[in-house]
Amino acid sequence: MKISKMQVHNIRSILDCTINMADYSVLIGQNNVGKSNILAALRLFYDKIKFNDAEDFPKIQTTDNESWVEITFSTTESEQALLKEEYKTADGFLKLRRIFKTDNKDFPIKASNSNIFAYEHGVLSNRNFYGAKNVSLGKIGDLIYIPAVNKIEDI
């Protein structure tokens, strides 16, 4: 699976952002424009860091009380074959949303769940993707994050 698109909603300084990805993607920009927050959103999706409402929800006015990251994966035929029927698509994409905060009672957010929800037949399902937290995270691969090194001693 490859990430083809990432959408971020109400994470740190990002209210709404869509990034189309390629095989290799680069984030370029001036200081303090949100590059690190894009990476933080990706790390939040993969459960590498935990969502903290006080730190991760925007400090500025938002249009709603939701916080989520949505990733669209392009899959191969063999990867599609391994998916449950409800997650398979004709175009070979798998679209998942990890919800960190919401007032919508249709999406039960629990610490014991992955809180990753899949699109089924083009509609966001309110059932957790593959149910158990460890199973759902195992289905989407892993993220390797290499932090910046400021001192030679840190290498």
Task: Mark where each language-model region is.
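Beta-strand secondary-structure signal
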Residues: 5-7, 18, 68-72, 95-97
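Pre-Walker A-like glycine/lysine-rich segment at the N-terminus of P-loop NTPase domains
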Residues: 1-47, 57-59
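Glycine-rich phosphate-binding loops of NTPases
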Residues: 37, 50-63, 77-155
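Solvent-exposed residues in well-ordered beta-strands and their adjoining turns
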Residues: 9, 22, 72-76, 101
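Conserved long hydrophobic alpha-helices within structured protein cores
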Residues: 40, 64-74
